[in-house]
Amino acid sequence: MTVTTLGHPLAPVFAAAPLSPPTHRDIWWLIIVKTLGVFAFLVLATLFMIWAERRVVARMQQRIGPNRVGPFGLLQSLADGLKLALKEDIVPTLADKAVFILAPVISATPAFLAFAVIPFGPTVSIAGHHTNLQLTDLPVAVLFVLAMSSLGVYGIVLAGWSSGSPYPLLGGVRSAAQVVSYEIAMGLSFVGVFLYSGSLSTSDIVAAQAHRWGILWAGVSFAVYAIAMVGETNRAPFDLPEGETEIVGGFHTEYTSLKFALFYLAEYINMVTVSALMTTLFLGGWRAPWPLSLWSQANVGWWPVLWFLIKLGIVLFVFIWLRGTLPRFRYDQFMQFGWKVLIPVNLTWILVEAAIRVVNVSNWRVWVIPFAIFLALVAVGTYVADLVRQRSEVGDGGPILGPALVPNPDSPYPIPPLPGQRPLVGVLEARTDDFPVGSAAEPRNGGDGDA
């Protein structure tokens, strides 16, 4: 497929590789079977991921993990689900009952819908009918996944607002800010893939990776997406909406029984979905890795499903690995990283990749390459200048506490300094005249008190 614009010379920039075969029109019972198959896969993947996460993190912490229910503890997640179903369903007195009950459903439903456009494999024969191993495909399938992941945050925000408690509200507000920040970086990381494949369809993107995976020609986009998908799913080290040490349990503090289980289910399904999307966009999708791709039957029949699941499992393991090894980010660090690092780097990479695509199909090498290099240098220089400015502020001691913020040495509740501020030891004497006589902020004992 080639996108043409009235014979414009830039039209071949978006020329794609040979696309996948046309989607077969499925009969009604085949659609039902595929729908139930996707639903069952997501539920089983969630149960397995919970078990795997508990076992792997336990090994990292020199523990054993669940090993009582079923062989190797494989049925422990199912037992926990039954336990949650039998627990008392409590609705707080101050909660908005209708919204409180609806919020988990709003969070879980888009998580299931987003997986509908992920291709598991090529065209296969089921009971004599040829069908793609994909529930459905859309011309804008990747944007559909992005939209569904955005809708899920509405359930989290409504859960925090309707609980009638300050901690869930803080968790909901954090989640909204987090999604707004990292959804932009995630969406921009898709642009590099679109430039190369020439399509927004997941099947066409997999077909465009027949000879070279997306990670090779969009490595920067892959790195940005890998970081953004962790922030998008509220997973460690970006699990700020449910930070136990700060806001108890975050947005689901007041939830119990099946409503809590729905939030848990939505979180893990979102993990599976963003991991499957990474596999589809950057890791060749269901196509066999080298050297297995040299086998003529590697990308035919049901074998591609195995390659897809192996890649998916590797990406999901990274989620577990991050949770067991990295501490939680501070909120200001997290937001600053998204807006000042990921988005500028992604925008610069899009310009560079677009310039490279233009160079490949035209004779504009004279000015396109220097222009791309100039943009890259400007982006790097801006980032370095920002780092130097921050370090110089820290080296100088940062801003001095004003009179209204000077702690009272006699108070049993001292005010902790904010990031970048320095104690006023040795400075109070020089600033004694700035304080009103007899005020609470007036320094005691000749200015020897600690700030």
From Swiss-Prot:
GO terms for biological process: aerobic respiration. The chain crosses the membrane at residues 30-50, 98-118, 138-158, 176-196, 213-233, 262-282, 302-322, 336-356, 368-388. Pfam families: NADHdh. It catalyses: a quinone + NADH + 5 H(+)(in) = a quinol + NAD(+) + 4 H(+)(out). Its EC number is 7.1.1.-. It is found in: Cell membrane. It comes from the Bacteria. NDH-1 shuttles electrons from NADH, via FMN and iron-sulfur (Fe-S) centers, to quinones in the respiratory chain. The immediate electron acceptor for the enzyme in this species is believed to be ubiquinone. Couples the redox reaction to proton translocation (for every two electrons transferred, four hydrogen ions are translocated across the cytoplasmic membrane), and thus conserves the redox energy in a proton gradient. This subunit may bind ubiquinone. Belongs to the complex I subunit 1 family. This is NADH-quinone oxidoreductase subunit H. It comes from Acidothermus cellulolyticus (strain ATCC 43068 / DSM 8971 / 11B). The gene is nuoH.
